[in-house]
UniProtKB/Swiss-Prot annotation:
Subunit structure: Monomer.
InterPro entries, per database record: Arg-tRNA-ligase, Arg-tRNA-synth_N, Arg-tRNA-synth_N_sf, ArgRS_core, DALR_anticod-bd, Rossmann-like_a/b/a_fold, tRNAsynth_Ia_anticodon-bd
Gene name as annotated: argS
Database matches in CDD domains: Anticodon_Ia_Arg, ArgRS_core
Name the record gives this protein: Arginine--tRNA ligase
UniProt catalytic activity: tRNA(Arg) + L-arginine + ATP = L-arginyl-tRNA(Arg) + AMP + diphosphate
Residue interval(s) of motif 'HIGH' region: 121-131
Keyword Aminoacyl-tRNA synthetase listed: yes
Enzyme class: ligase
Main location group: cytoplasm
Highest classification ranks of the organism: Bacteria, Bacillati, Bacillota, Bacilli, Lactobacillales
């Protein structure tokens, strides 16, 4: 139980009109620490109690069991709590030094499954910065949900089906060079894809030709299938190389093509339940009662199925296969309407578990304010970007620590971590402008800044030969250490907030605050000097390092021991 929960619990025992949860939401942190550590405003009770807030505050302060606190005083309409810093710091440091990386572990999920649909790049197209967001947000959410007791199933729903394969087949047959594709598959396929789209703008017959080749593919034409399989295999080799660089793993690569033989069953269920209506030759499900104006288009007039039919098949398969407690789709916010339709159709089909489906949208990555587009060839490719980030990180590491061993390995952890962290510190629904120089900076609110704070603490602990197992009683009550203690104590709540809001940026911002607070402490405190507080200061440094490393791990970012 953290301090705010303790206060809320104590107040709930003497306030009849508010429960603990409501009180917790009302608690504030005073701007001036002389006014206490936490304050409860009594305004909300004035109407019910029919008393002035000042009088209520005075009565509450007198009734509080102040043994848990240094003192409890009423100041105007506020009840101000002054915490026993020594006792709380001892308790927090003891918990972290004992539990280590398991500090803040919880069992909220009771080992139930969370399915995370993430990354999902299109086959035969390069892995760009645009795909990065879904990949790193999904990966971070997986770590966060595991931390609070869920098991996760990471699904890479590959874009390995659709009209674009018709376009690619036409382009390859017109202009493709087998040897060139074998040598540089994605580069060559991208050139072909950009060219066919550019030419199709002036020649509509290319579109029709592409549709025809896709129809052949759907009907199992041997040549079409062989080309499709080749494009898929070559793309996957490249994707897996990049996933290895990012240290992201998946439990399933079942993409769109996997559901080709599962969509008829969906159409049959919809038909049996009398949910299909005919509209201009197409089959649709009316969703007006859910406030959704446009019906869900299940089957086109030419008999072709659509994305939503495939996603319905995928949802049914995943529920049956994994019995999920939550099913999360980490997909751009431009798909919001699609996921509203998906949930509504599942609800119409009578599946209560449609409530367990959540679309986790995210904003766009731009470059100099402009939208990126594979089709137009305006794209930032991930592989050269990672290489450049690693190179920039190495230059800075060499300047700071020329004698450092394993520079290449550490530069890789810093460069990749910088890209991931910059993405994840951004509020998920906001976009951001891609700026590699800002990402890899060791100053400011960046991954390298947090990693460097961690490495600095490790250096201090090595010099002191600190062993948490042999440490004794800790007690700190100075202002700088108290700021750190409060953050560390808050870590479990931070993790819960990140999970509840599907928002890794909450963890990233916490990591920045903790690194900043420690750096401030380091600047004002001689940690290694012999003094009565030396062990406590080292324990505080150790606890900060444990929590920083764990926060970075939850973001999928490594924490090098030396930089």
């Amino acid at each position: 139980m953290n301090t705010k929960e303790l206060i809320a619990s104590e107040l709930a025992s003497i306030i009849d009109s508010l429960d603990q949860e409501a009180i917790l939401k009302l608690l504030e942190t005073p701007k001036n620490s002389e006014m206490g550590d936490i304050a409860f405003p009594a305004f909300s009770l004035a109407k019910v109690e029919r008393k002035a807030p000042q009088m209520i505050a005075t009565e509450l302060a007198e009734k509080m069991n102040s043994q848990a606190f240094e003192k409890v005083v009423a100041t105007g309409p506020y009840v101000n709590f002054f915490l026993d810093k020594s006792a709380i710091s001892a308790q927090v440091l003891q918990a972290v030094t004992t539990e280590k990386e398991h500090y803040a572990d919880q069992n909220i999920g009771k080992q139930e499954n969370v399915v995370i649909d993430m990354s999902s790049p299109n086959i035969a197209k390069p892995f760009s910065i645009g795909h990065l967001r879904s990949t790193v947000i999904g990966d971070s959410l997986s770590h966060i949900f595991q931390k609070i007791g869920y098991q996760t199933v990471k699904v890479n729903h590959l874009g390995d089906w659709g009209k674009q394969f018709g376009m690619l087949i036409v382009a390859y047959k017109k202009w493709g060079d087998e040897e060139a594709v074998k040598a540089h598959p994605i580069d060559e396929l991208l050139k072909l894809y950009v060219r066919i789209n550019a030419e199709a703008e002036n020649d509509p017959s290319l579109d029709e030709e592409a549709r025809e080749w896709f129809r052949k593919l759907e009907n199992g034409d041997e040549e079409a299938l062989a080309l499709w399989q080749w494009f898929r295999d070559e793309s996957l080799v490249e994707f897996n190389r990049l996933y290895n660089e990012l240290k992201v793993e998946f439990d399933s690569y079942n993409g769109e093509a996997f559901y080709n033989d599962k969509m008829d069953a969906v159409v049959d269920i919809l038909s049996e339940k009398g949910l299909l209506l005919e509209s201009e030759g197409a089959q649709v499900v009316n969703l007006e009662k859910y406030g959704i104006e446009h019906p869900a288009l299940i089957k086109k007039s030419d008999g072709a199925t659509l994305y939503i039919t495939r996603d319905l098949a995928a949802a049914l398969y995943r529920k049956n296969e994994y019995q999920f407690a939550k099913s999360i789709y980490v997909v751009g916010q431009e798909q919001s309407a699609h996921f509203k339709q998906l949930k509504a159709v599942l609800q119409e089909m009578g599946y209560d578990w449609s409530d367990d489906i959540t679309h986790v949208p995210f904003g766009l990555v731009t470059k100099e304010g402009k939208k990126l587009s594979t089709r137009k060839g305006n794209v930032i490719l991930l592989e050269p970007t990672v290489a450049e980030a690693v190179s920039r990180a190495k230059v800075q590491i060499e300047a700071k620590n020329p004698e450092l061993e394993n520079k290449d390995q550490i530069a890789h952890a810093v460069g990749v971590g910088a890209i991931k962290f910059y993405d994840l510190k951004t509020d998920r629904t906001n976009g951001y402008d891609f700026d590699l120089e800002a990402m890899v900076s060791f100053e400011g609110e960046t991954g390298p800044y947090v990693q460097y704070a961690y490495a600095r603490i490790q250096s201090i602990l090595r010099k002191a030969d600190f062993k948490p197992e042999t440490a004794g009683n800790y007690s700190l009550n100075d202002t700088e250490s108290w700021e750190i203690i409060k953050l560390i104590q808050d870590f479990p709540r931070i993790i819960n907030r990140a999970a509840d809001n599907f928002e890794p940026s909450i963890i990233a911002k916490f990591a920045i605050s903790l690194a900043q607070s420690f750096n401030k402490y380091y600047a004002h405190t001689r940690i290694l000097d012999e003094s009565p507080e030396r062990d406590s200061r080292l324990a505080l440094s150790y606890a900060t390092a444990v929590v920083l490393k764990e926060a970075l791990r939850l973001l999928g970012v490594e924490a090098p021991e030396k930089m």
